[in-house]
Amino acid sequence: YADAIFTNSYRKVLGQLSARKLLQDIMNRQQGERNQEQGAKVRL
């Protein structure tokens, strides 16, 4: 019983961690694109 609870919460935490990492990756990618756009405007 305790094992089942532990496994369940462990899975939940893992899911939250991977979701958070995914969000950070997306945010970083958007930030990079924005920076590239600004750099292109500066060059023009």
Swiss-Prot record:
Example of a GO biological process term: adenylate cyclase-activating G protein-coupled receptor signaling pathway
GO molecular function, a single term: growth hormone-releasing hormone activity
Record localization: Secreted
Key words, A-Z: Amidation, Secreted
Modified residues (Leucine amide): L44
Primary localization class, coarse: secreted
PROSITE patterns reported in the protein's UniProt record: GLUCAGON
Claim: Secreted is one of the keywords in the record: yes
GO CC annotations on file: extracellular space; perikaryon; terminal bouton
Similarity remark: Belongs to the glucagon family.
Functional summary from the UniProt entry: GRF is released by the hypothalamus and acts on the adenohypophyse to stimulate the secretion of growth hormone.
UniProt name for this protein: Somatoliberin
Upper taxonomic lineage: Eukaryota, Metazoa, Chordata, Craniata, Vertebrata
